[in-house]
């Protein structure tokens, strides 16, 4: 099973022409009076693959949901057709649609934890899916098919895991289970909406190869929705680019990625960080000679005393003023545990952290070392105004009176590229990129010397990523900040970092200059991470101009 999953997808050899299986004609979708999708057209045959890309608000996920008529409340198809084998799903009565949805066309959602039922075992959920369209087959037969499905998608020891609940599986395994549920009835069309967004590079590669294998070997038509052009390059033979609800360009993936015609496609490609591009950190700032933050022998474990699971083991790190140190590793490697230890949120079990030669205690850590969170939506309290959110560290550390804090908030908003008037507004009124700027302003409020950025751009579109990265670089230049930049995207990490440290199972297995670590890795794990990064073909000369 593993050999099949790890075989690279062959998207450079599109399948031979087939009769149209899925045909979307002039699709229009609206939420109230707001048009979300306007005039989308495409066709897909058995064994063919189509990637739909675009930034947040482009309409790509709405298009995917419309294919199965699973639009959220208030959404409706206002025009066009979605034809599956000539049958218009957009016009079907709900009862007839239920017989098609899940059986002939199925969906894999972005977040398996919110899509899987947390109080039902995986075996029970597969059994329900098999019963929904499979008639009255014996329970033992359904259980055997559930095991076959889990084995097909590469879940180890499938027969032993039917009784396990979703939280007992890793993120990658949960996504495999979602794919197994979608395949329960040999669906002719599989729609995958951002199937690897939250996954690390090696797990992402496994899921992409699994989808490509299903597409190739089972003849399932595959639609992949993503904001990541590298994901589409690895998986889909054809590409459709959306912006503001409309298709701006479509065609063979290889052609669009090397010779795009539309200015928007060109701008998307130009914003994608490339692993082969050298670090830009040295041109931005020069680190100080003496380390500012020194970590020695840091250890942290979780769980009951007799069965404690180590999250960090003997971690050593140095961080200099004006330096960006990139920290990479998969989920469970200890990256976020280290971040929480440095800001004083989780005291380590062993080891020391010193700041400017002095032990870094909890209160000092909470002022000198500030955290920028991954999720710009969950990390801002929706009940507070932006001004109050940014002022929270000032209030906590009793810095300034009310008027001084208001002045500091206005200064910080302008520093991160927002209007001072934003202070009176709610976080709900801002985009993801703007919310991340607010989060950065909050982190800067008590004038820290160190920023710990925990996946600060992973939830953002590529063009917004580039803007936030440039903002962090400018702030580092102006304020002399030391930055610990935690991420799983090695291309982004190389771009922003002076040095890179690789964390694996709680230990630093390699560290060194960013360009050297990427081009000449010394540890097998680093090489494995690098090999898993989706690659884009090189654009033809002048094609992005």
Residue map of PLM features:
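Helix-to-loop junction immediately C-terminal to a conserved catalytic motif
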Residues: 68, 72, 343
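Conserved ABC transporter NBD signature motif
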Residues: 76-88, 351-361, 365, 510
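Conserved ABC ATPase "signature" region
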Residues: 88, 141-160, 404-421, 531
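ABC ATPase NBD coupling module
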Residues: 89-106, 124, 132, 254-260, ...
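Conserved ABC ATPase signature
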Residues: 164-169, 173, 426-430, 434
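ABC ATPase C-loop
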Residues: 177, 182-183, 438, 444
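A short, proline-enriched helix->beta-strand linker immediately N-terminal to the Walker B motif
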Residues: 184-188, 445-449
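ABC ATPase "signature
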Residues: 247-251, 259, 508-512
């Amino acid at each position: 099973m593993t050999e099949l999953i790890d075989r690279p997808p062959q998207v450079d050899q599109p399948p031979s022409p087939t009769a149209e299986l899925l045909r979307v004609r002039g699709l229009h979708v609206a939420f109230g009076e707001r048009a979300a999708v306007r005039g989308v057209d495409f066709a897909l045959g058995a064994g063919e693959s189509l990637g739909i890309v675009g930034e947040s608000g482009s309409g790509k996920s709405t298009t995917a949901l419309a294919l199965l008529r699973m639009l959220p409340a208030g959404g409706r198809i206002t025009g066009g057709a979605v034809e599956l084998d000539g049958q218009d799903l957009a016009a079907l009565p709900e009862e007839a649609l239920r017989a098609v949805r899940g059986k002939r066309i199925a969906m894999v959602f972005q977040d398996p934890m919110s899509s899987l039922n947390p109080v039902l075992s995986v075996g029970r959920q597969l059994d329900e899916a098999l019963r929904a369209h499979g008639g009255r087959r014996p329970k033992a037969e359904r259980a055997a098919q559930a095991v076959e499905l889990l084995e097909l998608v590469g879940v180890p020891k499938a027969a032993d895991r039917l009784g396990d609940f979703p939280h007992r599986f890793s993120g990658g395994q949960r996504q495999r289970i979602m794919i197994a549920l979608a395949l329960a009835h040999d669906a002719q069309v599989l729609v995958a909406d951002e199937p690897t967004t939250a996954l690390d590079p090696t797990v992402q590669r496994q899921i992409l190869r699994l989808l490509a294998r299903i597409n190739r070997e089972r003849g399932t038509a595959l639609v992949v929705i993503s904001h990541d052009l590298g994901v589409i390059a690895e998986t889909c033979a054809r590409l459709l680019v959306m912006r503001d609800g409309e298709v701006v360009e479509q065609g063979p993936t290889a052609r669009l990625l090397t010779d795009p015609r539309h200015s928007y496609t060109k701008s998307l490609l130009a914003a994608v960080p490339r692993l082969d591009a050298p670090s830009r950190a040295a041109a931005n700032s020069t680190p100080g000679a003496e380390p500012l933050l020194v970590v020695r022998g840091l250890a942290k474990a979780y769980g009951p005393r007799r069965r404690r699971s180590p999250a960090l083991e003997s971690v050593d790190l140095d961080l200099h003023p004006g330096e960006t140190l990139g920290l990479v590793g998969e989920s469970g490697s200890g990256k976020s545990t280290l971040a929480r230890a440095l800001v004083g949120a989780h005291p380590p079990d062993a080891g020391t952290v010193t700041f400017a030669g002095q032990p870094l205690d909890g209160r000092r850590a909470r002022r000198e070392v500030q955290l920028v969170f991954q999720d710009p939506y969950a990390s801002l309290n929706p009940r507070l105004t932006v001004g109050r959110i940014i002022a929270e560290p000032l209030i906590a550390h009793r810095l300034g009176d009310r008027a001084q804090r208001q002045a500091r908030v206005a200064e910080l908003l302008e520093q991160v590229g927002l209007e001072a008037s934003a202070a009176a507004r709610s976080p709900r009124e801002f985009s993801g990129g703007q919310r991340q700027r607010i989060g950065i302003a909050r982190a800067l409020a008590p004038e820290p010397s160190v920023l710990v950025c925990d996946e600060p751009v992973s939830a953002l579109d590529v063009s917004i990523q580039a803007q936030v990265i440039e903002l962090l670089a400018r702030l580092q230049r102006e304020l002399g900040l030391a930055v610990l930049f935690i991420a799983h995207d090695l291309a982004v990490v190389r771009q922003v970092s002076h040095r890179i440290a690789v964390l694996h199972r709680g230990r630093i297995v390699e560290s060194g200059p960013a360009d050297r670590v990427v081009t000449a890795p010394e540890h097998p794990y680093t090489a494995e991470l690098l090999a898993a990064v989706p690659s884009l073909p090189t654009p033809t000369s002048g094609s992005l101009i």
